[in-house]
Amino acid sequence: MVNVVLALLSGFLFFAGFAPWEIWIAPYVAIVLLFRILCDKALPERFTYSLLAGLAFFLPLLHWSSVYVGSIPWLVLAVGESLLFAAIGLVRWQRRWENALLFSVIFTAIELLRMKFPFGGFGWGRLGFTQVDSLNWLYPWIGVTGISLLVSTSAFLLISKSKTIVVILSIIAATFLLSKILSPDTQGKILQVTAIQGGVDELGLGFNDRAMRVLERHVQATTKIERTDLYVWPENASDVDPLKNEKARLLITDLVRRLESALLVGAVERTLEGPANTSLLFGADGEVESRYVKQDLAPFGEYMPVRRIAESISPYAKQVNDFVPGDKWVRHSINGNPFQSLICFEILDDDHVKDGTKGTTFVVAQTNNATFGRSSEAAQQLQITRARAAESAREFVVVSTTGFTSHLDAEGKVLAKAPQFTAESLTMKVKLVDPRHETPAQQLSTWFWALILGLLSGSAWWRISR
């Protein structure tokens, strides 16, 4: 019974590292506690304790997925993630440093697996998202996956030889000094950007039931700000296709001509193949200068895998239209400065984010959080976005229909944040980075980390078998 309680405590401590708690030290304690519980146990016990820890972690973490659609989708998602998490219990563990090293490696590998599998993956709840306030200077060097490995290595350090601890701490200290010396070139350029959080009439799945209402709210919330170079609207700000609907097009073109500035619009287009989630840059003359189509679609939100099964589980599955994904990155540009839009779910996959942030001077994260009500989803998503800003060493303009609309600096710190659930405009001075600048983390793919994890696990297995 004691181990059952400790397993549940371990899972809750993992959860405590994420919003709304964001206690960065909690995952360190959780990983050590989980390792100690699993040591010297039989397979049934290991798997049971791992599963209990996973449930205590993912059930509260993903509770936002039950808002408006009921408990069944939430339970299916949380249990599915917990089963993948519980794979850590399939290996026999002992209180030896080689086992602890292997534990941290396999734990990180399971996180990468969750990021990619199934249905393209769901990387929510990775330890690498929890350390922005404690290790933000390290993100540009090793990225989210590297941070996950570092946190999970706590179990390794606990029983490691003192010399090993000294070596690892020395490497971390050297990296900290390098991060201060080799900071990215900001070019000395500043771009004034105004993010518009127009809000919705009603939170929930029917936030856009009244045609054009969300668009009208964003038009009304957009007022002319002196010297603003770019206005940005969130995902789904135009709930009707502004390229096909004449009234919607006129509302936007009249607005940008009055503003005398460019406007980035999150819109839902209607194509012959199906709806497309797009980011449209309207120039000051009212013409569309660039168009990016979201590539990494959210399973069960923007398309429905195993539709027949999903519809038998939840009636809301029938309301999901299958969106058409884009097939390439399209850089927007303002005053000759390239930037990229990442749309909502696109911030989750390491490789996708790294490809998207390369060659940019800053990044816009467009999202719509109206469908998750007053849950912690928006705060958790902002935490993830902060990690991405630190990883790419680029400032982020985060714009949401209902919040949190924010300005993040290149270290992932929140410089400004609009309150939730109100119509707000947030004007920020964005420091631009040389688009040629790439952090070391931006050059490390999932395949690289798979190789590193493979080498580390092979080394640990060799030491164990001796």
Where are the regions that the model predicts?
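Membrane-embedded alpha-helical bundles of multi-pass enzymes
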Residues: M1-I181, T223, R374, T385-R388, ...
